[in-house]
Amino acid sequence: MIKIVLNGCCGKMGKVITECASKFNDLQIVAGIDKFPYETSYPIFETPEDLNLDYDVLLDFSRAGALKGLLNLTEKTKKPLVICSTGFSDEDLALIEEKSKTLPLFRSANMSLGINLINSLLRKVTPLLYGNYDIEIIEKHHNQKVDSPSGTAVLLADTIKESINDETKFVYGRSGASKREENEIGIHAIRGGSIVGDHDVIFAGVGEVIELSHKAISREVFAIGALKACEYMGNISIPGLYTMDDVIGITK
């Protein structure tokens, strides 16, 4: 049995993860970390420093501001940390990269199987289409999401950029009077209502448009992905920065 400590257990995703965990025979949430606790089947600690029990995997589905405290705890326990939060700064990402040299860390901007398959497809199709097709990314989320563009949109944009043997640049939204340049990758964010998460990658050519689209119907898809990452990382002790590609067996 893999024992999980869930940071952000009282948030929207934390509650969904707690519910979904009961469907996994090899996983058990033994404790949570949250500043605003509510009644659960497991004990809740207000900060990582307060945690006083043993665990196998630390799962974070909260906000970027929790990162340093979680890394401090991970350095003490040497147990795997699964990072599912988004909104990290370049400094945060560099810190994760540095700490992964000595700790087993997992990070993904999106935990769904579908998004990660699309991300894998982008590595293959982008080199074939770039130059003849303009590339734009549109992401839509609920009106309570605080980071923009979404971590998933950034993930997809980075994959596209890395797949192109050219100097490309990101353009966030469009306004004013200016013509689109060939080497631009447009990224656009929409916020409204209760949209769980929609992502469209558009390759617009002459006479045709190719789209890769993903629509999340329920938060459960992210919860299941996070728990599968815990299953995978529960058997990992070697330092490194692991991703959903490792969990689902995608070869780059």
Swiss-Prot record:
Known pathway: Amino-acid biosynthesis; L-lysine biosynthesis via DAP pathway; (S)-tetrahydrodipicolinate from L-aspartate: step 4/4
Active site: 141 (proton donor/acceptor), 145 (proton donor)
Matches recorded under PROSITE patterns: DAPB
GO BP annotations, alphabetical order: diaminopimelate biosynthetic process; lysine biosynthetic process via diaminopimelate
Pfam families: DapB_C, DapB_N
Documented EC number(s): 1.17.1.8
Keywords attached to this entry: Amino-acid biosynthesis, Cytoplasm, Diaminopimelate biosynthesis, Lysine biosynthesis, NAD, NADP, Oxidoreductase
GO molecular function terms noted in the UniProt entry: 4-hydroxy-tetrahydrodipicolinate reductase; NAD binding; NADP binding; oxidoreductase activity, acting on CH or CH2 groups, NAD or NADP as acceptor
Gene Ontology CC: one annotated term: cytosol
NCBIfam families: dapB (TIGR00036)
Biological function: Catalyzes the conversion of 4-hydroxy-tetrahydrodipicolinate (HTPA) to tetrahydrodipicolinate.
PANTHER family: 4-HYDROXY-TETRAHYDRODIPICOLINATE REDUCTASE, DIHYDRODIPICOLINATE REDUCTASE
Similarity comment: family membership: Belongs to the DapB family.
Protein's name according to its UniProt entry: 4-hydroxy-tetrahydrodipicolinate reductase
